[in-house]
Structures are given as C-alpha cells and as structure tokens.
Amino acid sequence: MDSPLINSPVKHWCEFEFISKTVKNPNIHIKGNYSYYSAYWDQGFERCVVRYLHDKASTAEKPIDQLHIGNFVCFGAECVIMMGGNQLHRPDWISTFPFDTRSFLPAGDTVIADGCWIGSRAMIMQGVELGEGAVVA
C-alpha cells in the first residue's frame, strides 16, 4: 500500500514533533527544546492536542488562560489538553447551555512541569497543574 496516511503529514508511526519548533500560539509557553509530541495519526500538536485556546495574545482587558509546558515532556498520539475556561457552561445557572458570552469564567493556567509523560488519548482538563515527572495514562 503506497498511499500516504489520510490527512496526515506524518509518514511513519515513529515520527515525532519537537513542539518548541512548531507551536506559534502566544498563549502556549514552552520551556526548553526537548518536549515532543508523538504525531502519528493526526496533524500536529497545536492543531490536534490543544483545544479551545484562543490564538490571540492575552491582554488586561481580555485575559486568556495560558498553557505552560516544561522541558522533556512526552505527549502521546491523540492526547488532548482542554483549555478555554468553562467554555461558557455555567453549572450554577438554571441551565448549562451557553446562552451568553458573559457566562465565561477562566479556569486558570494549565501547567505541565518538566519530565511529564502524557499517554496516548489521555485528557488533561483546563486549569490543572501537573507536577514534575507526573504520568497521565
């Protein structure tokens, strides 16, 4: 079978992406150069892993939760990092339906410390802080 993987720039199952070289979002802060994403099956870290993070820089008028990633962090294929605060869903209102943009609440920054290992298809929720060497399966 000579056809490339559908919708994927990755040519082989063992390819990976050094995220410090590819991430452009000003709200993602990467410490060091050795954190990587096992990019098999999809279109890269920023597009497929980080969800609901605005690509405009945070300002005093419009603060945006930040994603901080340490050095030597390993991200497995198809893992997900949820961002975007409460995504307009307010459990303290009569309905969790996102009726109004004023219903947004920030969740706080998400921090993934040095040496963490995020397994394939694992999910990290917004506002979480993972300590050094944490493993998420």
Give the role of each language-model region.
Residues 21-22, 30-34, 38-41:
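DNA-contacting interfaces and partner/effector-binding or oligomerization modules
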Residues 1-29:
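Extended, small-residue-rich solenoid/repeat segments and analogous flexible loops
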Residues 127-137:
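Basic (Lys/Arg-enriched) interaction patch that binds polyanionic ligands
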Residues 7, 25-27, 33, 71, ...:
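Detector for Asparagine
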Residues 36-128:
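Flexible, glycine/small-residue-enriched loop-and-beta-strand segment within the central core
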